[in-house]
Amino acid sequence: MLYPLSILTSEKNVFNEDVYSVNVPGADGYFEVLAHHATVIALLQPGKLTIINKDHQKLYFGITTGFIEVSHNSATIIADAIESVQEIDVERAKQSYERAKMRLESPDKHVDKERAKRSLNRAKNRIKLFLEIHPQVSFIPLKALLI
């Protein structure tokens, strides 16, 4: 059974369609929302968001943080940042990873280490999702970043 799903950021409406399900990275682990799901508001952590749309196709997104609200047989996701896996620029993600790693290793006391950790985790998530969705691509150096 289908239900409406909306995905929003502060900048745009990313997705607004009827879906069969959405699988999200909750703060306590992944969970799936189907039609007639119980009412819930949950925090989301960085990870992969998977949608099964009305054509039974799987759509994959990388999400940073946000929350999901499920009520009255509909779901809304508010995300700090989200992008379709097809939009991931893996070279840019690799550069972000390397910049964040340099900031974390910097002896400079003025470097915001928490911000650098978040940047590093976002870059790792983007690389991991890219490799997961494109298994035919062999990026040994990228896989090494995930260790």
Swiss-Prot record:
Task: Supply one GO molecular-function term.
Answer: ATP binding
Membrane topology term: Peripheral membrane protein
One cellular component term (GO) for this entry is: proton-transporting ATP synthase complex
User: Which positions carry the signal peptide feature in this UniProt record?
Assistant: none
Q: Taxonomically, which superkingdom? A: Bacteria
Alphabetical list of InterPro entries matching this protein = ATP_synth_F1_dsu/esu, ATP_synth_F1_dsu/esu_N, ATP_synth_F1_esu_C, ATPsynth_dsu/esu_N
Q: Where in the cell is it found?
A: Cell inner membrane
Write the record's keywords in alphabetical order, separated by commas.
ATP synthesis, Cell inner membrane, Cell membrane, CF(1), Hydrogen ion transport, Ion transport, Membrane, Transport
Question: Subunit composition?
Answer: F-type ATPases have 2 components, CF(1) - the catalytic core - and CF(0) - the membrane proton channel. CF(1) has five subunits: alpha(3), beta(3), gamma(1), delta(1), epsilon(1). CF(0) has three main subunits: a, b and c.
HAMAP family attached to this UniProt entry: ATP_synth_epsil_bac
Cited function: Produces ATP from ADP in the presence of a proton gradient across the membrane.
Regarding protein family, the annotation reads: Belongs to the ATPase epsilon chain family.
Protein known as: ATP synthase epsilon chain
Q: Which organism is it from?
A: Protochlamydia amoebophila (strain UWE25)
